[in-house]
Amino acid sequence: MFGLPRPVWLLGWVSLATDAATEAIYPLLPFFLTRVLGATALSLGIVEGAAEAVNSVIKIGSGSLADRSPSKRGLVLLGYSVSSIALPFIAITTSWPQVFTVRVLDRVGKGVRGAPRDAMLAVWTTPTTRGKVYGFHRGMDHLGAVIGPAIASAFLYFYPDHYRTLFALTIIPGAIAVALILLVPEPAPAPTSVESAVSRPVGPESADAGLRRRSSVDRQPSKGGLPREFTAFMLVLSLFTLGNSTDAFLLLKLTDVAGSTRWIPMMWSALHVVKATVSVVGGSWSDRIGRRAVIAIGWLVYAAVYVGFALSDSLPALLTWFLVYGFYFGFAEGTEKALVADLAPAERRGFAFGIYNAVQGLGALAASVVFGLIWKSYSAAAAFGLGGALALAATALLCVFVRPARLQLRDGTP
């Protein structure tokens, strides 16, 4: 269907089921932590930031292991199993450090599965469909994130304040995800970079005069056997992630302004409707007009949303900005992964995705803790303003240092 291989579809359904479980809980966590368990905004930042940092450390090892392991599917199965077992334990927590422990275990599972799963997806792509495949996968993630909060809202409508029961029931979609992984075939080993590396430019950017051949300096790998183009992108991405704090702060401000959690899960669901729609479009655009342009659009949207949250205290305005936020995810997330796959040799893609995920996670730790401190010490407006400014700076550097001439495909598929 849609020209995508069956394993891509199966992994998409796995992500849908897992996200349905995770996102049924996530939009309620800021309220649960701050109102039920008595945590502060700083504690919220520590919980979410540290969880993502642990996730990132695990992803470095899992990416390298995925390159060496004869069974990427085994790592994916292990990761999804850990998360599916850990997440429902939020139902019995009585303090924020306990939630912290559960969230860390959940993110350990995500860290184990992320890089090998992304490397598996790369096997079933071609240079012209890579953006579409990763965009589709993100779209299925977002679709699961639509279904989960919608079910949570319906459940809480009939059973008000039964948060713990809802959390416990997330074991059901988690079990479905684990069962589906068993149907995914183990991908064949990728060819070596000598056999697979090619120097074909991406899309219309090949029209630039400087794209005919790469210099001998550009051909040289950086540390870890990865090209310098990849390193440049990771450095720019690092700056962006320093302003990319946990989405829990957006939900916390919405909850504070709304004065209730009644509509928060539905708004989270609506956000993912936007994400799921735009991610497929963004992936296809990146195959046609180039990765850099689509990523830049997404980062600019992010900057606008954070500035909007800094300047607005009106609920209708915040709800509008919150929905616009979905365009950032739709344009940037899948396209960033497609660019990583473009720049990394086939036999190093697992490690490359591990580095990419590590940059994201470590940045989330720093961003979330700093955001929480600024919120507590100064104001929410100052914290959101800083995030927007860093996103603008990163976008400018992306356009300057990640040049079109550097976006070369390295593919291990015919």
Roles of regions detected by a PLM:
Residues R164-L182, A382-V400:
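Symmetry-related core transmembrane helices of the 12-TM Major Facilitator Superfamily/SLC fold
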Residues A91-R103, A310-W321:
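Helix-loop junctions at membrane interfaces in 12-TM secondary transporters
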Residues V102-L143, L339:
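Cytoplasmic helix-loop-helix junction between adjacent transmembrane helices
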Residues P173, I181-V194, C399-D411:
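Helix-loop junctions on the cytosolic side of multi-pass membrane transporters
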Residues F31-V36, I147-F167, A366-A382:
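Transmembrane alpha-helix termini and helix-breaking/packing motifs in multi-pass membrane transporters
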Residues I58-S71, L156, V278-G290, W375:
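Helix-to-loop junctions at the C-terminal end of transmembrane segments
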Residues G74-P88, I171, A293-G308, G388:
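Structural signature of the two symmetry-related core transmembrane helices
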Residues F2-N55, F230-M267:
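Helix-loop boundary and gating motifs at the non-cytosolic
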